[in-house]
Amino acid sequence: MTDALNDEQEVDATLRAVLRDVLGLPEAQVAAFDESSPLFGALPEFDSMAVAGLLTELEERLGILIEDHEVDADMLESFGSLLTFARSKTLQ
């Protein structure tokens, strides 16, 4: 396994843990998320207040900085879009 693959898997696992911890979602629900699983607007737990907590927790756990101008509805739309964003931030 390459370091890049390990890093991608680590970001995936971290994102799932953050979604579980911040939103209070069941482990089984989070484990079942795939790239197309809808998030913002589809999960009642994922409201505007939860977005702030989720992004703060991602910053802390991944050691990244998320700028306000980077946050938009497209990035929060699905598990896949949020995962792609988080992975891109870890590469910067």
Language model segments and positions:
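Phosphopantetheine-dependent thiolation modules in NRPS/PKS and related acyl-activating systems
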Residues: T2-F46, A50-T56, E60-Q92
